[in-house]
Amino acid sequence: MLEFPISVLLGCLVAVKAQTTFPNFESDVLNEHNKFRALHVDTAPLTWSDTLATYAQNYADQYDCSGVLTHSDGPYGENLALGYTDTGAVDAWYGEISKYNYSNPGFSESTGHFTQVVWKSTAEIGCGYKYCGTTWNNYIVCSYNPPGNYLGEFAEEVEPLISTVSSSSSSSSSTSTTSDTVSTISSSIMPAVAQGYTTTVSSAASSSSLKSTTINPAKTATLTASSSTVITSSTESVGSSTVSSASSSSVTTSYATSSSTVVSSDATSSTTTTSSVATSSSTTSSDPTSSTAAASSSDPASSSAAASSSASTENAASSSSAISSSSSMVSAPLSSTLTTSTASSRSVTSNSVNSVKFANTTVFSAQTTSSVSASLSSSVAADDIQGSTSKEATSSVSEHTSIVTSATNAAQYATRLGSSSRSSSGAVSSSAVSQSVLNSVIAVNTDVSVTSVSSTAHTTKDTATTSVTASESITSETAQASSSTEKNISNSAATSSSIYSNSASVSGHGVTYAAEYAITSEQSSALATSVPATNCSSIVKTTTLENSSTTTITAITKSTTTLATTANNSTRAATAVTIDPTLDPTDNSASPTDNAKHTSTYGSSSTGASLDSLRTTTSISVSSNTTQLVSTCTSESDYSDSPSFAISTATTTESNLITNTITASCSTDSNFPTSAASSTDETAFTRTISTSCSTLNGASTQTSELTTSPMKTNTVVPASSFPSTTTTCLENDDTAFSSIYTEVNAATIINPGETSSLASDFATSEKPNEPTSVKSTSNEGTSSTTTTYQQTVATLYAKPSSTSLGARTTTGSNGRSTTSQQDGSAMHQPTSSIYTQLKEGTSTTAKLSAYEGAATPLSIFQCNSLAGTIAAFVVAVLFAF
């Protein structure tokens, strides 16, 4: 459905007497519109909008009176006219109804003004005008909101005239000495079907034919009610006496229909019929030779049915019908001799059909037999009036869209019988009414006047049965479509499609129909998250997205060739993402990256044709299913690629001052590769990112030194006599690096009274498990010793197990693992005078050399903060000296 209104045509220019002003312009134009809208079914009156009127008047004021009409192309619907009065323009627009074809509703250049005037959804109007002199007279502009003339909505928005939905009846009567009056009454409310509707009722004595074709055959039938009554009577005369009998009978059937719209997503209804009969008879005679019998019966019946269906949008419809029938007085004056008998037989049959979406049938039959003999007493009996009502209503919940196609335009719209539903429910109700009425005896006394009244009360029995069924089918087959015909008498087609949960059935009888069903199901899931232990952390995430859609199109027309196409498209996409960050930098192998893409397409087509003497039907079924599976795996590994580092400690003595210098260095880069690979049609793309070794807290060097004056003579302590202890605490930072970051450092020697100078002592090593070089330089008047301590891989990179003695491991939401040491743990037993804090948050290495073997409290060396590290360093130096 297009979401823009089609511009309506321009008004025609006619010559009328000029009128320059319209004092009651607003009310006249509004009333003229509403007068015409009131002629159509369910079309509400318009209201005046000052906003629309201002818009229309502004556009009218801009007109150049050139005689050329051009639309404003604004947001509203619009009608233009030139040369008319205010109401004359509306009359001219509505006059296009004579050219509108309700059998083929749609937009036409010759009816665009009319359809905008009566467009059911339009609620507001505003108009303006401009006088263009004696040549063109008045220029009229009317704006409508919401606008009309939308493609695909004409059948629903342009309602037929109320007069076309009417009830018609005809009757005739005749009287003779040998035949009673026979009358036929037919009343119907016709459905709007494409082929029209014809009702013919006939009897022996009279006949009547009723034919009604609605003006809008495209609208779906909402109510069908028809009734026919045939009364026959015969009289037989025996003997030579003369019998005169006159009787009259009339049956009046009236129908009252009403419809209402109920918004409901799923509703079922049952039909109930109630009936009551009151019967009385009386006889009053003052004449011994005459008698009068009067019988009256009333049988009001009411029936209501409500059906609702739920589609992609909620639609519900309910209708109710009230049916009442009555038989008026039957009288027969009798005069006869004792040798003459008169018998009459009457049969009354009434048939009423109500249709609301589905079939509701009410059948009522009554048969009355009476015989009268000319004697001192006569009797009239009417027994066993029985009626039964059975009704069946089904409702379904479905998701579907109907599309009508016809190559020959034989039938643009059709009646659809059947339903397509994911789940369906039905309600069946039946009721039976049994009546026994009118059992009266009339006594006539020839000698005296006798009045006798006798009546029998009616009996009514109602039975009701209701059953509700629900069904649901789940299959994984592709859609199939088939169609068949039988000698142009009936058309039937069955369409089933199922991807996930759906079943559909469409059938028709003698009509053309078309339907389209589209079902889409989506499923997504996220699965499998695991974290392996020991030296690495792995996270696996799998996301699966499955999309499947089924489209079924079935079309059958009255043309000689019918094309039915079924398409089944199913797409499935699965995406798997694997992230495997490895904590061990010595493991230089990246996790494998798996990529896969699989696309499979399969389909089948078949063509079948059947030929008979009346019609040829060709059925073509095409089924295709496409499945696409795309899997992408991304693996990430975090480690440091062969970092080399060294830590050296130098002790220099000069002028009775001892300078202790510790230097941390990092001589090579540490790589952080991240590989992301994907494959499309067996072509892989890989990107690797390398990151260099980080600096120490953002600085290029880091040096810790302390110069003190000893209490004794200068002494150079050999480096080999220094015992050493290495303690490493590992933590995960935001980048998940696990290596120890150090940098080359040039020591600064501070001598009292002298200018500080840079020391040239530093040590490097290419690999963590190789000994670092030792360099020693002697300055003038000074002696120095540099000792480099080797740290092994096992000490530097060991990840404490969560089961180690005294260890405490905490895992946060970011997936990082932090290991800390509790008090009393054997992992921390430092005795040192020098302490170096490396890159905070990554690793902490304490290089401790004991001069005097003094122990330091354990709580200082918990590697928890920089403050604790500095305190440890100061305490260690004080103990050393």
Curated annotation (Swiss-Prot):
Topology with respect to the bilayer: Lipid-anchor; GPI-anchor
Key words of the record: Cell wall, Glycoprotein, GPI-anchor, Lipid transport, Lipoprotein, Membrane, Secreted, Signal, Transport
Description of post-translational modifications: The GPI-anchor is attached to the protein in the endoplasmic reticulum and serves to target the protein to the cell surface. There, the glucosamine-inositol phospholipid moiety is cleaved off and the GPI-modified mannoprotein is covalently attached via its lipidless GPI glycan remnant to the 1,6-beta-glucan of the outer cell wall layer.
Signal peptide: 1-18
Chain residues carrying a lipid of type GPI-anchor amidated glycine: 853
Subcellular location(s) per record: Secreted, Cell wall; Membrane
Region Disordered, annotated ranges: 262-313, 381-400, 453-494, 579-611, 758-788, 800-830
InterPro entries: Allrgn_V5/Tpx1_CS, CAP_dom, CAP_sf, CRISP-related
Biased composition (Low complexity): 599-611, 776-788, 808-820
Domain of life: Eukaryota
Key word Metal-binding present: no
Annotated propeptide span(s): 854-881
Induction entry: Expressed specifically in daughter cells through activation by the transcription factor ACE2. STE12 represses expression of the full-length transcript and induces expression of the short form. STE12-binding to pheromone response elements (PREs) at positions -175 and -161 prevents SPT15 from binding TATA-box 1 and thus it binds TATA-box 2 at position +385 and directs internal transcription initiation at position +452.
Gene Ontology CC terms: cell periphery; extracellular space; fungal-type cell wall; side of membrane
Glycosylation sites: 101, 360, 488, 535, 547, 569, 625
Domain SCP: start-end pairs: 30-144
Pfam families: CAP
UniProt-listed SUPFAM superfamilies: PR-1-like
GO biological-process terms attached to the record: conjugation with cellular fusion; fatty acid transport; sexual reproduction; sterol transport
Extent of Polar residues compositional bias: 386-400, 585-594, 821-830
Primary subcellular site in the record, as a coarse category: secreted
Family that this chain belongs to: Belongs to the CRISP family.
Protein name as annotated: Cell wall protein PRY3
Gene that specifies this protein: PRY3
